[in-house]
Amino acid sequence: MNHRGKAQIMLIKFDIYHDGDWWCARGMGVDIFTQGKTLDELMKNINDAVELHFEENIEAGEEITVVSLTEFQVGSVAKISGC
């Protein structure tokens, strides 16, 4: 916490992409990389990787909250007749 008693928020952005059979996440601005077979597994692995990366900070009493915002680019969708 900072000197005013408010927890500091650390925002870590991840580049998430699909590579073969794996969903991959690369931290932007931090050396974190993880992967999972599903998006749910990837999100769990991101949380685990962040905890490991910032282990010393957590042991020193800092609170780190992972907030995920996922954005996907979708290709063109076929037009459905009648719509």
What spans do the regions from the language model cover?
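Short aromatic-glycine-(Arg/Gly/Cys) micro-motifs in beta-strand/loop hairpins
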Residues: 15-27
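A short, exposed loop/beta-hairpin motif centered on an aromatic-Gly-Thr core
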Residues: 30-40
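Short acidic, gly/pro-rich beta-turn/loop elements at beta-sheet edges
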Residues: 24-26, 35, 44
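Short, charged, surface-exposed hinge/linker loops at domain edges
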Residues: 1-15, 44-83
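Residue-level signal for pocket-adjacent positions within structured domains
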Residues: 27-28, 59
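Residues that cap or initiate secondary-structure elements
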Residues: 20-22, 31, 78
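A periodicity- and composition-biased signal for non-globular, repetitive helical segments
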Residues: 19, 41-43
